[in-house]
Curated annotation (Swiss-Prot):
Gene3D superfamilies: Homeodomain-like. Keywords: Developmental protein, DNA-binding, Homeobox, Nucleus. CDD domains: homeodomain (cd00086). Residues 1-20, 26-140 are annotated as: Disordered. Residues 140-199 bind DNA. SMART domains: HOX. A motif (OAR) lies at residues 313-326. SUPFAM superfamilies: Homeodomain-like. Disulfide bonds: none annotated. This is Short stature homeobox protein 2. The lineage of its organism: Eukaryota, Metazoa, Chordata, Craniata, Vertebrata.
């Protein structure tokens, strides 16, 4: 017990010495508010959380010394406790302001009210970037160029001369028409695409029309040839024998295939041998052969006339379409 009392008294003596070395409340009042703001050791001893460790130790020692003064050995502690109590008794507004300034200057790592967290900064930067992207997308919208009639005429005239004008021609035309070279280049690209599309449509239309004329010739040898007769031949050849009818059908198919082979698309030449029938057998009467050849000639003539009429009509249709297109363009 005596050892414990000696240890406590020794610790109290050390704390009293530290307190004497610290700045007292009276010295702070005499020195003014500036000294209290500059020196961190001038804070109030009675505060627990916001005071320095040395001052907290001095205040605690004074309180403990005041409580154990009856045990003998805490006289200095009692005096320190009284000083601490007197120091913590009265507070002035100036003192509180000085303590707030000292705390802000003493704790540089504490968060300030003016500082912004990094997450909030990142969010603001992301929102700003999204707004900038939206503005750039709106600005990148292309505006359609409205060409005048004179500009279209000049462009069409140069397109008739060449479909691929060089840079010098485009620059000269752009200066003459008051357009940019990029606009002229884009117009020629669109015009070439439109021209290719029209050519493909016309080519497909001609092929479909020509193939529909000779659709009856594209049959296999085992198909019933009786169904391939022309309507105008049914009444005139009712009294023909079955053998002569077979010969006539063979001649008709041979002539039609030969005509299609020479005038239709070249890729049908490979299929022509499969369309032909074997030659008529020998030993038939000459009158029958002559009648069959005459009927075959009439069939060939009718097919040629139908082809010529269809060709003329297709050319007329193309010319009419060209006139309509020119009228639509305002040429």
């Amino acid at each position: 017990m005596e050892e414990l009392t000696a240890f406590v008294s020794k610790s109290f003596d050390q704390k009293v010495k530290e307190k004497k070395e610290a700045i007292t409340y009276r010295e702070v009042l005499e020195s003014g508010p500036l000294r209290g703001a500059k020196e961190p050791g001038c804070v109030e001893p009675g505060r627990d959380d916001r005071s320095s460790p040395a001052v907290r130790a001095a205040g605690g020692g004074g309180g403990a010394g005041g409580g154990g003064g009856g045990g003998g050995g805490g006289g200095g502690g009692a005096g320190g406790g009284g000083a601490g109590g007197g120091a913590g008794g009265g507070r002035s507004p100036v003192r509180e302001l000085d303590m707030g300034a000292a705390e802000r200057s003493r704790e540089p790592g504490s968060p300030r009210l003016t500082e912004v967290s990094p997450e909030l900064k990142d969010r603001k930067d992301d929102a700003k970037g999204m707004e900038d992207e939206g503005q750039t997308k709106i600005k990148q919208r292309r505006s359609r160029t409205n060409f005048t009639l004179e500009q279209l005429n000049e462009l069409e005239r140069l397109f008739d001369e060449t479909h691929y004008p060089d840079a010098f021609m485009r620059e000269e035309l752009s200066q003459r028409l008051g357009l940019s070279e990029a606009r002229v280049q884009v117009w020629f690209q669109n015009r070439r695409a439109k021209c290719r599309k029209q050519e493909n449509q016309l080519h497909k239309g001609v092929l479909i029309g020509a193939a529909s004329q000779f659709e009856a010739c594209r049959v296999a040898p085992y198909v019933n040839v009786g169904a391939l007769r022309m309507p105008f031949q049914q009444d005139s050849h009712c009294n023909v024998t079955p053998l002569s009818f077979q010969v006539q059908a063979q001649l008709q198919l041979d002539s039609a295939v030969a005509h299609a082979h020479h005038h239709l698309h070249p890729h049908l030449a490979a299929h022509a041998p499969y369309m032909m029938f074997p030659a008529p057998p020998f030993g038939l009467p000459l009158a029958t052969l002559a009648a069959d050849s005459a009927s075959a000639a009439s069939v060939v003539a009718a097919a040629a006339a139908a082809k010529t009429t269809s060709k003329n009509s297709s050319i007329a249709d193309l010319r009419l379409k060209a006139k309509k297109h020119a009228a639509a363009l305002g040429l």
